[in-house]
Amino acid sequence: MKKLSILVTLLVFAGLLAAQQPVLSIEKTTHDFGKIKEQNGVASVTFTLTNKGNAPLVINRVHASCGCTTPTWTKEPILPGKSGTVTAAYNPQNRPGSFVKTISVFTNAGTNATVLTIKGDVIPKPAVSN
């Protein structure tokens, strides 16, 4: 009987631990810069990530689809009910025309990456005439 009550207690405790999960919520996953001028330099946007779970959310890594986009992100764990950020900085230098770039966010909230998208249209610098 004593062994059975210990086993039941351990199973209940294990179930409670398994229920402790971070839940990632992002209100907006796409940002359209619209028309940006190449001569204005880097264009940035910050995405807000909220932890709607009951365990800390950790951003393990963030990967941009090309070298023209530099991501930065919250490095410390995001506590339940709190928010963190991922900022994407797009460098339009020598990249006139339309663009669509992705930023993959890997967290402890699941095995799949959450994909953020930035897009816009780069207006080239005016040509220098002699």
Language model: regions and residue ranges:
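Hydrophobic core residues within well-ordered beta-strands of beta-rich domains
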Residues: A43-V45, G84, F99, T114
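Buried hydrophobic-core signal for structured, non-transmembrane domains
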Residues: V45-N51, A88, I103-F106
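Beta-sheet-dominated interaction scaffolds and their linkers
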Residues: Q20-L49, K125-N130
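Terminal connector regions
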Residues: R95-P126
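Sec-dependent N-terminal signal peptides
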Residues: L4-G15
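Surface-exposed loops/turns
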Residues: E38-Q39, P80, R95-P96
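Surface-exposed binding patches on compact interaction domains or structured appendages
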Residues: N54-T85
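Short, hydrophobic beta-strand segments
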Residues: V86-N94
